Amino acid sequence: MADVVFRKDFFVGEQASLVKTVSEADVNTFAKLIGDCSPLHADDDYARKSRFGRRIAHGMLTGGLISAVLGNKLPGAGGIYLSQQIEFLAPVYIGDTITVTVEVTAWQPDKRLITLMTDCYNQDKCQVVTGKAVLLVDRPAE
């Protein structure tokens, strides 16, 4: 495992992103993991007759991609999720390529609190998720 790097400072406007294509296996595995087997996610025939016209990914699967950026990139090591406001703007379909971008909107070094705007877009540049995250950035153990 690589050495973990704890950052000491961040700046407003700093960004990080991740790109992920949502596969059928991702949706099926997520459904089993959390126990949400809604036919909108699991049944082709049911989903085809729905307002979406085909199977959709779980909203929180997309939300989980935000967590991946926060935990691995910005703020990275030591980031402890305190809150996440999230709004689902459009469905994510199996096969969609999602770009997740987080941007620092506030950094309080005295409190070690970082606030980030969290946005997700599909391959057509349609915004599918927007929100705001607040994290405590812990220091490494001495």
Briefly describe each language-model feature range.
Residues 17-21, 87, 103, 134-136:
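Generic structural detector for well-ordered beta-strands
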Residues 40-42, 52-53, 80-81, 86-87, ...:
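Short, intrinsically disordered/low-complexity patches at protein termini
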Residues 1-12, 92-142:
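HotDog/MaoC-like acyl-thioester-processing domains
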Residues 1-79, 142:
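Hot-dog-fold acyl-thioester-processing enzymes
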Residues 35-37, 47, 80-82, 112, ...:
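Short, charged/polar low-complexity linear motifs in solvent-exposed/disordered segments
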Residues 72-100:
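Mid-chain, well-packed structural core segment of small domains
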